[in-house]
Amino acid sequence: MIIFKDMITGDEMFTDSSKYKVVDDCILEVECRHVTRRMGDIQLEGANPSQEEADEGTDEVTESGLDLVLNQRLVETGFSKSDYKNYLKTYTKALQDKWKEVGMSDSQMAEAKTKFTEAVKKVLPKVGDLQFFMGESSNPDGLVALLEYRENSDGTETPVMMFFKHGLEEEKV
């Protein structure tokens, strides 16, 4: 399994168990699903609930949302277009410092910066229609994932989470 982590904060953003694709070598798009889960609902294989003690009738607590957000404990945040541009300036600086720290060569950094700029140009016009998510630590210096709802040919919508490829590191487990 591959875990995609925020390069700056180390937060887990998603894993390769999610359906994803790379767009123009600069954005990773992850398809999400709406799910509802019962809290504390653990089913042990082979367990026979009819032979167990009767449940005490506790109130059932459920959580609903996007599978990726719930699984990775992503935290929703908000930006205006101007706030998002300011965030991108500070994030780009922090990212370049991180690239140096991990030993990227000048040519690799130049290519990564070019690809990052391409990615920003793709998402900036959509900022008003996007939702924003940070990693579990809620560190404002880290990567902010972008959620877009895309219309399908049958009229339904598919939630797609976008990540800047050059802000992620892969960890194989």
Curated annotation (Swiss-Prot):
Secreted in keyword set: yes
Name the coiled-coil region(s).
Answer: none
**What Gene3D superfamilies does the record point to?**
Metal Binding Protein, Guanine Nucleotide Exchange Factor, Chain A
Q: Where is the TCTP domain?
A: 1-173
On whether Secreted is a keyword of this UniProt record, the answer is yes
Q: Which family does it belong to?
A: Belongs to the TCTP family.
Query: What is the documented function of this protein?
Result: Venom protein that causes edema, enhances vascular permeability and is likely related to the inflammatory activity of the venom.
Q: What is this protein called?
A: Translationally-controlled tumor protein homolog
